[in-house]
Amino acid sequence: MLVNMNEVLRPAKKNKYAVGLFNAVNLELARGIIAAAESSRSPVIMGTAEILLPYGPLEEVSYYLIPMAKKASVPVVVHLDHGLTYDTCIKALELGFSSIMYDCSTDSYEENVRKVKEMADIAHSYGATIEGELGHVGDNEGSAEGSDHLADPSAFFTDPKLAKDFVEKTGVDALAIAVGNAHGAYKLPPKLDFERIRTIANTVDVPLVLHGGSGLTDNDFRKAIQEGISKVNIFTDINVAAVEAEFKKFQSMDKGLIDLIPAAVEAVKQESLVKMKLFSSDGKADIKNNQNVSANDIEALTKLVAAEVAKYLNK
């Protein structure tokens, strides 16, 4: 079933587990992710990122992600990860994505707040949820803080006091934080600031997101979730698992592309299952969001009702 992030992350925050976001730039990845979620009875977040659009255009990806989510027997969020531009975020909402991330973390704090607040209002009017980012998660070129490794890494970490202000001013439904994590496979061992995670989790009332999950140790994940992480982003691990399975299959056959597909799907399924069990989201598909309706929900519902009334009056 297609749901937004509130439906899966609020129960996760309350019950101390995390839901994985797995990016699916093609049908094989999507099939493996859904298969894992259904077999483990895990809620799941599936989507793509703006940086991945050259490998799977947003509109084309929506043609299979959204129908697959609706058909699934478990809650599935279809999410735009790291939307970098206003137009891409709007397009995702128009296509039916149930959640977006508007990443303005490299802007000034004031500009980040302004832009994300504007997009949050729009997303909520669609009944969708939105994730923002505060602090800067690097791209891992040489250290856990990417190309910024020559500077003090902690300078890019999320400030707990600003986190509270950011959430209150923007109305985001989830907050991605920088605590020593980085995108891509780690070249040097990461050092997560678990105390910072705990402090932020106790300061804000929305679920926290850990980007750059691929490459962290199992203990890193467990402790991060224990301290307050409710959503973990994964791509590198399933991407590598798929290509390794295809290469192994290719070496043992003399057939064509379609013979590689089952191997890729199964590899993605198995790697996703490992993560779902590690995050303790397995068996949680039927946990309902029983938290009180938020101000964002009320605002979104009010806008939807107003829009319907306006349509009626203009007939």
What are these regions (language model features)?
Residues M1, K16-V19, L80, L175, ...:
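Intrinsic structural disorder
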Residues V3-N15, V25-L52, L58-P75, H82-V204, ...:
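Alpha/beta enzyme core
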Residues V19, Y102, I258-I261:
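Active-site oxyanion-binding pockets that recognize sulfate/phosphate
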Residues L210-G212:
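Thr-Gly-centered strand-to-loop micro-motif
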Residues T217-K315:
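C-terminal alpha-helical cap/extension of soluble enzyme domains
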